[in-house]
A protein has these predicted regions:
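Short C-terminal domain-edge/linker segments immediately following a structured domain
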Residues: 60-65, 124-125, 152-159, 181-185, ...
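Core catalytic region of metal-dependent phosphoesterases/phosphodiesterases
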Residues: 2-117
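Binuclear metal-dependent phosphoesterase catalytic core
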Residues: 2-23, 118, 146, 170-221
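Active-site-proximal beta-strand elements of phosphoester/diester hydrolases
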Residues: 28-36, 121-128, 167-172, 199
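Conserved beta-sheet core of the metallophosphoesterase superfamily
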Residues: 74-78, 85-88, 132-197
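Flexible, glycine-rich phosphate/dinucleotide-binding loops
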Residues: 38, 65, 96, 131, ...
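Catalytic metal-binding/acid-base residues of hydrolase active sites
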Residues: 36, 62-63, 94-95, 128-130, ...
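His/acidic metal-ligating clusters that form di-metal
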Residues: 49-55, 66-68, 100-166, 220-221
Length: 221
C-alpha cells in the first residue's frame, strides 16, 4: 500500500520503501502506459496486479486517471491495498507538468525518472521527445548517458520488448492500442542477472467482463 507522499519528483513512496526496493534481489514491477482518460481500465489493472507487485510504473499520457484512483484510495481501504508501495510516473505529451490533489498539494511530474530496483537502474520516460514511434536509437543513447540498465517507455501505443543494445520495453496502450496490438499492460521481472517482461492483453467478454491474458507481442527483437 502506498502512503502517497511524493518523495521526489515522479516517485510516490516513503524513504523506507525506496530503500527496500533498492535492496531487493528480485522484484516485480507493474508497467502500463497511455490510458488517455480510461480511468476504469487503470482501476482494473491495479486491482488485478497491484498487490502482487513491488512497484508500479506509469509511462505517461493519462496521469489524471492514476491520480483519480489514488484519490479514491485515500477514502477506501480496499482500493488502497491495490497500490504497491512505490509508484513512478512520468509526463507524456498530453499530460501537465503538475497537478493538485487532496493527498498532495502539488504533484510534480518530470519527463524522466531513474528508478533504482535492486542492482538495476531503470530509465522511465514517455518517449515522444526521443521519437520512439520511428526508432529507439535516441532512447538507447539517452539511457547510456544516464547509466541505465533498462528503459521503460510509451507513446507509440505498441507493445515492444527489445534486448539488442540495452533492455527496453513498451507495454503498449492500456486503452487505445495501435498496429493491430491489444490493449494491455506488463509486469517487469527483475533479478540481479536478468530482466524481462510478461505482457498481458485485456480481453473483453460479451458481458463486459475483463480478463488479463499473457501473450507475446508481435514486435520483439
Amino acid at each position: 500500500m502506498n502512503c502517497f507522499s511524493q518523495l521526489e519528483n515522479g516517485i510516490f513512496a516513503t524513504e523506507k520503501d525506496i530503500q527496500e526496493l533498492k535492496n531487493k534481489d528480485s522484484a516485480h514491477i507493474l508497467v502500463y502506459s497511455d490510458s488517455h482518460g480510461k480511468a476504469p481500465v487503470v482501476r482494473d489493472i491495479f486491482e488485478k496486479f497491484g498487490q502482487k507487485c513491488d512497484a508500479a510504473i506509469f509511462a505517461g499520457d493519462g496521469i489524471f486517471d492514476l491520480l483519480a484512483l489514488m484519490e479514491k484510495a485515500n477514502s477506501y481501504d480496499e482500493i488502497s491495498e491495490w497500490l504497491p508501495p512505490v509508484i513512478c510516473i512520468v509526463r507524456g505529451n498530453n499530460d501537465s507538468g503538475s497537478y493538485e490533489t487532496s493527498f498532495c498539494r502539488a504533484v510534480h511530474v518530470p519527463k524522466k525518472v531513474l528508478l533504482k530496483v535492486g542492482a538495476k537502474r531503470i530509465l522511465v520516460t514517455h518517449g515522444h521527445e526521443e521519437r520512439v514511434q520511428h526508432s529507439t536509437e535516441l532512447l538507447e543513447s539517452t539511457a547510456n548517458l544516464m547509466d541505465a540498465n533498462a528503459v521503460v517507455y510509451g507513446h507509440s501505443h505498441i507493445p515492444v520488448e527489445n534486448n539488442h543494445v540495452i533492455y527496453s520495453m513498451n507495454p503498449g496502450s492500456c486503452s487505445y492500442p495501435r498496429s493491430l496490438s491489444k490493449p494491455g499492460c506488463a509486469v517487469l521481472e527483475i533479478s540481479e542477472k536478468n530482466i524481462f517482461s510478461i505482457f498481458y492483453k485485456i480481453d473483453f467478454s460479451i458481458f463486459g467482463l475483463k480478463d488479463f491474458v499473457p501473450y507475446f507481442p508481435d514486435r520483439m527483437y
